[in-house]
Amino acid sequence: MDPHQIIIRPVISEKSYNLIENEGQYTFEVDRRANKNQIKKAVEEAFDVKVKKVNTVNVKSKPKRQGFTRGRTSTWKKAVVKLAEGDRIELFEGV
């Protein structure tokens, strides 16, 4: 798989921002079929950094409604990537 097919988007939240500042860990939404090795290679190729560790979480869908219309959010996969000491991803710097 192409790195841009594996990494869907960065996850920007208060918790993910604290992980960046304190732990050097970056959070991404990734393709649900991707495994940890594929995610590691995709991040290393896309951002030219050295990945030390990858943790993944399958985030379940939640029921939602708007008025009488009921639906569900999509199930998605979250990857928390720890980089080698001294490496940073510039995409997250301006946030």
From Swiss-Prot:
Is Transit peptide among the key words of this record?
no
**An individual GO BP term:** translation
RNA-binding is among the record's keywords = yes
Q: Which domain of life is it from?
A: Bacteria
Q: Name one GO molecular function term.
A: rRNA binding
Question: Which InterPro entries does its entry note?
Answer: Nucleotide-bd_a/b_plait_sf (IPR012677), Ribosomal_uL23-like (IPR013025), Ribosomal_uL23/eL15/eS24_sf (IPR012678), Ribosomal_uL23_CS (IPR001014)
What keywords were assigned to this record?
A: Ribonucleoprotein, Ribosomal protein, RNA-binding, rRNA-binding
What's a single GO CC term here? ribosome
Which Pfam families would you find in this protein's record? Ribosomal_L23 (PF00276)
Q: Which PANTHER family match?
A: 60S RIBOSOMAL PROTEIN L23A (PTHR11620)
| Protein family according to the UniProt entry | Belongs to the universal ribosomal protein uL23 family.
Q: What does the UniProt function comment say about this protein?
A: One of the early assembly proteins it binds 23S rRNA. One of the proteins that surrounds the polypeptide exit tunnel on the outside of the ribosome. Forms the main docking site for trigger factor binding to the ribosome.
Subunit details: Part of the 50S ribosomal subunit. Contacts protein L29, and trigger factor when it is bound to the ribosome.
Q: What is this protein called?
A: Large ribosomal subunit protein uL23
List the top taxonomic levels of the source: Bacteria, Bacillati, Actinomycetota, Rubrobacteria, Rubrobacterales
